[in-house]
UniProtKB/Swiss-Prot annotation:
Family: Belongs to the cytochrome b family.
Organism: Oreoscaptor mizura
Flavoprotein in keyword set: no
Effect on the protein of changing G16S: In strain: Isolate SAS-3
Classification lineage: Eukaryota, Metazoa, Chordata, Craniata, Vertebrata
Location of this chain's protein in the cell: Mitochondrion inner membrane
Additional free-text comment from the UniProt record: Heme 1 (or BL or b562) is low-potential and absorbs at about 562 nm, and heme 2 (or BH or b566) is high-potential and absorbs at about 566 nm.
GO cellular component, one term: mitochondrial inner membrane
Annotated protein name in UniProt: Cytochrome b
Any single biological process term in GO: mitochondrial electron transport, ubiquinol to cytochrome c
Length: 379
């Protein structure tokens, strides 16, 4: 008799995806972050669901309802901080996951990669709207500043912003719709993640060498299930440490002040995971130019398959490209630091130079380095 695992319509899908899936024998810990992102998403949906049971999306009571969750709801403080810091862990895993894809040439799986870029945009949109919900000072002013960027779009800009606001400023209508979108988007993200996996399983996983691993496959279970569980334990340990010892480490103290449209905070800045893009936005003095640079800083990922000029897929055997990759990582860390600094000398010029370097590295230097390495192969 054939195992039910291989015949049952539902079990068959699970079996093909997580049990009997043929996986390369040499994928490193950098391949753990896909499963960690899945865990983060499940955690965010569950904690978010319990928060939504006690949260009210009204400008008069939103801030109070979050205070109520932290003070009066059983383990409400834990749920709230797991959700807030879970977002930070989500983005850490996301950035590493994307970085892994860039380093090892995973972007050559076009469908998987493009769905991934869409997922990145969806997660960023969700995180932004979630940050508005507690209705603190940074929530309100962050929402005002970021939505206002759309007014830079010629002709339709102003109408578009007022349509998103549901009025002439960020107010009750804005908060209510942001809550609605913040609730629905994670489920859309989960569906997209399913499609992401579907496309991945059409080709099979890439591996550190960038070579075909068809001749050397091992079953996903038990080898990678146990490896993913280890990764999950480390993730849970890191998140628990953050939540229980310094839950406000990555947050902004200004968000403990209720939103006040009449009082602008001295430094409006987003959460740490958006600072690199915020620095690129601020480094261009023109509003529309800044918005385009902001969008393109993420959208540039979609161009990666077309900018690949190397004869090899992975950077494993390409030392010049490796140096440029780590320079790009350092540049992004610099941009993250600059995004959190006030707009004054020397931060402005550092931000502008880092922004120029970011685009130059991806669009010019890395493709040129790949061509150079191709020629070095002939020696």
């Amino acid at each position: 008799m054939t195992n039910i695992r291989k015949t049952h319509p539902l079990m068959k899908i699970v079996n093909g995806s997580f049990i009997d899936l043929p996986a390369p024998s040499n994928i490193s810990s950098w391949w753990n972050f896909g499963s960690l992102l899945g865990i983060c998403l499940i955690l965010q949906i569950l904690t978010g669901l319990f928060l939504a049971m006690h949260y009210t999306s009204d400008t008069m009571t939103a801030f109070s309802s979050v205070t109520h969750i932290c003070r009066d709801v059983n383990y409400g403080w834990l749920i709230r901080y797991l959700h807030a810091n879970g977002a930070s862990m989500f983005f850490i895993c996301l950035f590493i996951h994307v970085g892994r894809g860039l380093y090892y040439g995973s972007y050559m799986f076009m469908e998987t990669w493009n769905i991934g870029v869409i997922l990145l945009f969806a997660v960023m949109a969700t995180a932004f709207m979630g940050y508005v919900l507690p209705w603190g000072q940074m929530s309100f002013w962050g929402a005002t500043v970021i939505t206002n960027l759309l007014s830079a779009i010629p002709y339709i800009g102003t109408d578009l912003v007022e349509w998103i606001w549901g009025g002439f400023s960020v107010d009750k209508a804005t908060l209510t719709r942001f809550f609605a979108f913040h609730f629905i988007l994670p489920f859309i993200i989960a569906a997209l993640a399913g499609v992401h996996l579907l496309f991945l399983h059409e080709t099979g996983s890439n591996n550190p060498s960038g070579l075909s691993s068809d001749t050397d496959k091992i079953p996903f279970h038990p080898y990678y299930t146990i490896k993913d569980i280890l990764g999950a334990l480390i993730l849970i340990l890191a998140l628990s440490s953050l939540v229980l010892f310094s839950p406000d480490l990555l947050g902004d103290p200004d968000n403990y002040i209720p939103a006040n449209p009449l009082n602008t905070p001295p430094h409006i800045k987003p959460e740490w995971y958006f600072l690199f893009a915020y620095a690129i936005l601020r480094s261009i003095p023109n509003k529309l130019g800044g918005v385009l640079a902001l969008v393109f800083s993420i959208l540039i990922l979609a161009l990666m398959p077309f900018l690949h000029t190397s004869k090899q897929r992975s950077m494993m055997f390409r030392p010049i490209s490796q140096c440029l990759f780590w320079l790009l990582v350092a540049d992004l860390l610099t941009l993250t630091w600059i995004g959190g600094q006030p707009v004054e000398h020397p931060f402005v010029i550092i931000g502008q130079l880092a922004s120029i370097l970011y685009f130059t590295l991806i669009l010019i230097l890395m493709p040129l380095a790949s061509l150079m390495e191709n020629n070095l192969l002939k020696w």
